[in-house]
Amino acid sequence: MSETETSHGASIRKRPMQKRAQERVERILAVATQMIAEAGSDQLRMSDVAARAGISIGSLYQYFPDKAAIVRTLAEHYNEAGRDCICQGLDGVSSPSELEQAFTELIDEYYAMFLSEPVMRDIWSGTQADKALCDLDLEDARANAQELAAAMLRAKPARDPDATASTALLIIHLGEATMRLAIQMPEAEGRRLVDDYKRMALRELLD
């Protein structure tokens, strides 16, 4: 398999059970993260990852069939971190004022994370061009929307659950689109876009 072929949705080939194997996978991902931060995922080569990680190319292929699998695994890790952040941020919401504060803080934190994480920016920028990453992105958006919808219903129990679920999914999707646009712009302009998004989203959240 060439280094430019994709695995059509595969991430890590096998989940390591032994500590030594787990440490090897962590080292591979750490090296890949560093290389993407340096030159972008387009320049990532399996042979270079293996060399910098200090393993043979055969050992690398035991865990990852191609570079797309490495990128997908990194995307999964970032999505998990983002979902944990959302769950923690919305967990205590029980009123409209708490929802407004929690949502505002989450968006600010999310934007700051994108500004400080070049690898996350790189992966997100390529999401729409990669079917597997696009599917993963939709799965992540649905999971995050469920958390947001639950918080919206706690804040305002009289809401219609189905309408709330649709609204939450749109808010999450538009938030992701806003982040993608904002990180391509000068920071001051990007910040204004994020602030505009917050105002628009809060109108729907608190309606």
Residue ranges and their predicted role:
Residues 24, 74, 78, 82, ...:
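Hydrophobic/aromatic residues within well-ordered alpha-helical segments
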Residues 73, 87-115, 171:
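Hydrophobic alpha-helical connector segments
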Residues 1-23, 184:
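N-terminal intrinsically disordered/low-complexity leader segments
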Residues 21-32, 49, 74-85:
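Generic hydrophobic, amphipathic alpha-helix propensity
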